[in-house]
Regions:
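A substrate-engagement module of RecA-like helicase motors
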Residues: 21, 38-178, 283, 290-293, ...
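Conserved RecA-like P-loop NTPase helicase motor core
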Residues: 423, 435-445, 496-601
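Walker A/P-loop NTP-binding motif
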Residues: 6-10, 26-39, 56-60
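Conserved helicase motor "Helicase C" RecA-like lobe of SF1/SF2 P-loop NTPases
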Residues: 470-495
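Signature of the SF2 helicase/ATPase Hel1-core->accessory helical subdomain module
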Residues: 35, 48-51, 55-59, 151-152, ...
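Conserved RecA-like ASCE P-loop NTPase motor core of nucleic-acid helicases/translocases
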Residues: 40-49, 366-370, 464-470, 594-596
């Protein structure tokens, strides 16, 4: 893998690398990155991988190469501005709803804010990073009291604390480093949205690449609610002398009325009253922006800057939604009243086009993950990131690359794909059990047959079970059943405590079950006897009412493709592969992946899904599986 990555850097061809758990893929791209003659950016999806790179892999690599002549071992971590404490906000105060700077909130929240402020000042004194990940325990709401978004920031030259700023110092370190570690979202903002966030680079490694399209979609999703517009109007009232801020507040009322008349879910055709309300908000926000007093030289005021930023955000989101672009999907999302009530959301219908035009044409990109071959092939993932299957060339190039699907003016983007395998012998270490005898899952959650099956399997394994469920309700129902019928085991459900605490309990006591939803499907690494059974209640297709997925599926059908296979089955295959990957994490692990959904072996699409999984020995016989689990449990002790 290291040789192929280095070759890709040198010849400028894009590369997809499937590298199974345990192959050491991070070192396989970090070594060529250190040896490359220009800066390399590594983008990850999760904080856990960033921590692994920065706290484990890179220090070991630097120690190994520090005496090599002509090799730069410098590296830096770069995140979005809101991930760093803001010294201006900490020292000058936070704007309230009227834009007045308030020192500290009252009550217990005020005490926690003071703790965060003290931590940030200590970081500033000791040349710390001021990163959120290193801060004392806090909520999102608390963190907003000590941080700002990029739009709210005064800017280095206009801020009294610009030279001390944690975010600016992180950018300075990145500009002096050979290697920049960042995340998918920041990469998207820099490369696709064209907002310069990362120092100049020509090569990108996208790790956890199976996540990249979802993360880029997330970064390009905008939200707008009545509360957002009202808040922006209230903050603007202190700075705008005319009626423009009041007009914006009136527009919020029109939006509230139009939202109340609309239905939850995807909006294919914007109703006239909602379209009118969005235009009203857009125009009122534009007028309000024009009414803000101009800032003079050295006349920086955080309250004014942040009030204006709020109005600018409302304008941008309303303008995008009112445009009703075919390239966007609009929907109404219903939140609890305490969390703000209904909101409008807009997201790109697809991201492969922007990725191809804005990232792949300008940079050399290496995509890597343990899960890149879906249905046994790279084509699905390649297409999702903007590379055409017809542009793939053999690992050893032969002849000229020809893409017959490209027009005369369209640039061909050749790429290679390699699977470097796995150190694990899945055929001997793992069993895939499909409960063919069970009824297909219904809409009413887990039935008696599924609950009986879960209890029997968990009993045979004597705990040691990670349950991956399609909904929080299903996870909690299963947990209640196992607790009632197997009281000698410890059964934990997601939500009982914070995920790190649940994971710690799961590891410490082998006679434990941990049941949860999506964050457990991809974020848990538990090698050893702790986890010998991974339960999956149903094939994880997206919900039929998911606005974005359903729109993408319909668009694929309309373009002559198979929307179900291209969108729903691909989504399910990716999650199934990730979920199954929780079982075998080392060469000594053994266990069972149990799928309680018979469609994996009875439906036509089952072959595609199975081809996306590790090559485990497969059975549909429950007696065989229970005996295997009992043997594993007795040998584990």
């Amino acid at each position: 893998m290291a040789e192929e990555v280095a070759r890709s850097f040198d010849d400028g061809l894009h590369l997809l690398v499937q590298a199974g758990t345990g192959t050491g893929k991070s070192l396989a791209y970090l070594v060529p990155s250190m040896l490359h003659h220009k800066r390399v950016v590594v983008a990850t999806a999760t904080l856990a991988l960033q921590h692994q790179l920065v706290e484990r892999d890179l220090p070991r690599l630097v120690e190994a190469i520090e005496h090599e002549q002509g090799v730069s071992s410098s590296y830096a971590v770069l995140k979005g501005r809101s991930n760093y404490a803001c010294l201006h906000r900490i020292r000058e105060g936070v704007p309230d709803d009227q834009g007045v700077l308030v020192d500290v909130p009252e009550g217990s929240m005020g005490k926690q804010v003071l703790e965060l402020r003290a931590w940030a000042e200590e970081q500033a004194e000791n040349d710390g990073t001021g990163e959120r990940d290193h801060a004392p325990r806090h909520t999102d709401r608390l963190w907003r009291q000590v941080s700002v978004s990029a739009r709210e920031c005064l800017g280095r030259s206009r801020c009294a604390f610009g030279d001390e700023c944690f975010a600016e110092r992180a950018r300075d370190r990145a500009a002096e480093s050979q290697l920049v570690i960042t995340n998918h979202s920041l990469l998207a903002i820099d490369a696709i949205e064209g907002v310069p966030m990362i120092p100049e680079y020509d090569v990108v490694v996208v790790d956890e690449a199976h996540e990249v399209t979802a993360r880029i979609t997330q970064a390009a999703t905008d939200e707008l609610s009545t509360g957002d517009v009202e808040r922006a109007a209230r903050r603007a009232q202190r700075w705008v002398e005319g009626s423009e801020a009041d007009d914006l507040d009136d527009a919020a009322g029109a939006l509230e009325g139009a939202l109340a008349q609309s239905e939850p879910g995807r909006i294919d055709r914007i109703p006239a009253d909602l379209a009118d309300a969005l235009v009203l908000v857009r125009d009122a926000a534009r007028a309000c922006l024009g009414a803000f007093p101009k800032e003079g030289e050295g006349d920086a005021d955080a309250g004014r800057s942040q009030a204006r930023a709020g109005v600018q955000e409302v304008f941008n989101h309303a303008e995008r939604m009112a445009a009703d672009l075919e390239s966007d999907v609009l929907w109404r999302n219903d939140r609890e009243p305490a969390r703000g009530g209904p909101q409008l959301c807009v997201a790109p219908l697809q991201v492969w086009g922007p990725m191809r035009d804005k990232l792949l044409r300008d940079k050399t990109v290496v995509f890597t993950s343990a899960t890149l071959m879906l249905g046994g092939d790279f084509s699905v993932v390649a297409s999702s990131v903007g590379l055409k299957p017809s542009e793939r060339i053999p690992t050893e190039p032969v002849g000229e690359v020809v893409d017959e699907s490209s027009g005369p003016d369209e640039e061909v983007l050749p790429w290679r794909g390699i699977d470097v395998g796995s150190p694990f012998d899945y055929g001997k270490q793992a069993i895939l059990y499909v409960a063919r005898h069970l009824p297909s899952p219904g809409r009413n959650g887990l039935g008696k047959a599924q609950l009986d099956e879960i209890v029997e399997l968990v009993d045979a394994a004597e705990g040691r079970t990670l349950g991956l469920f399609s909904s929080r309700r299903a996870a909690e129902t299963a947990a209640e059943e196992v607790r009632a019928r197997l009281p000698h085991l410890t059964t934990l459900a997601q939500g009982d405590a914070q995920l790190p605490e649940l994971a710690r309990q799961f590891v410490e006591d082998p006679h434990t079950c941990l049941f949860g939803t999506l964050s457990l499907w991809q974020g848990l690494d538990v090698p050893g006897d702790t986890c010998q059974l991974v339960l999956i209640d149903r094939i994880p297709f997206p919900r039929p009412d998911d606005p974005l997925m359903s729109a993408r599926q319909r668009a694929a059908d309309q373009s002559g493709g198979n929307g179900f296979m291209q969108v729903a089955a691909t989504h399910a295959a990716l999650l199934l592969a990730q979920g199954s990957g929780r079982l075998i994490r080392s060469t000594t692990d053994k266990g069972v992946v149990a799928v309680l959904d018979p469609r994996l072996v009875t439906a036509r699409y089952g072959g595609f899904l199975k081809a996306s999984l590790p090559p485990m020995w497969t059975t549909t016989d429950p007696a065989v599986v229970r005996k295997a689990l009992a043997r594993l449990a007795s040998s584990a002790g």
